[in-house]
Amino acid sequence: ALFIIIYSYQLLFVPVSLLGRAVERAKRKKGSQSKPPALLRYAVLICARNEEAVIGELIDSIKSQTYPIELVTTFVLADNCTDATAEAARGHGAIVYERQDTKHVGKGYALGYLLARIGEDYGDIFDGYLVFDADNILMPDYIERMNEMFAGGKYEIITSYRNSKNYADNWISAGYGLNFLRDACCHNHARSLLGTSCFVSGTGFLFSRRIKNKIGGWTYHMLSEDIEFTADQITSGVQIGFCRAAEFFDE
């Protein structure tokens, strides 16, 4: 009973999200006269462990974006791999680093290592950093939509609409798919409409160069490093935005 009471406020998010979608559709029908956004430079960060079977599909979906491809650089960290993840990623055109470290294990350590190597080799040339898991696939306009919001200057951290890649496979994948829907539509979308901060959930998010420099790369190493990152930024006064138009698929 206590659990239900604590989480009952989330019931408010459902009508807020539904009403918000209706308002957004009406605005799209009217059209917008806003000027085109600035075209910013992005680094895509992918930390992968034994993902040779799927990583090529993600890289291909990045290369097929409607956003100018010369402004997007894809970096892969083959982390403690025992398969051909590095070779597969290179074969699809990514810049690949490799790490073997059985003491500092986990995505948080991998992201920190990858950002440090990028800083050594490329300096601070990227305006924003996009984070994905190796089994993701992006809609063709994903980066274009994220850039529209990011270039507006209101948000330095933006999360996006995570959809299911394999909803119909079994009851477990269906459960994950429904959870993705709940996070996107009933939580982050509603929170953004109410003017409160959204949350980052593992993959499909963007953070600015200033945020990277402020925290010193990536310093979150808990098992749920995404929630650690979210909590740290919100308590520091940073509001996290949600871009519903930027859709990607996850397993």
What are these regions (language model features)?
Residues 40-43, 73, 228:
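Cell-envelope/extracellular polymer assembly enzymes that use nucleotide-activated donors
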Residues 1-38, 89:
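N-terminal membrane-anchoring/stem segments of glycan-assembly enzymes
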Residues 60-71:
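Short, acidic, metal-binding catalytic loop of nucleotide-sugar glycosyltransferases
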Residues 77-86, 101-103, 137:
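A conserved acidic beta->alpha catalytic loop
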Residues 56, 83-90, 98, 141:
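Acidic helix N-cap motif at the loop->helix transition within catalytic regions
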Residues 195, 221, 230-249:
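Catalytic donor-sugar/metal-binding loop of nucleotide-sugar-dependent glycosyltransferases
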Residues 98-100, 104-123, 140-223, 234:
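Long helical/loop segments within the catalytic core of UDP-sugar-dependent glycosyltransferases
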Residues 122-137:
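Short beta-strand-to-loop acidic/aromatic patch adjacent to the donor-nucleotide binding site
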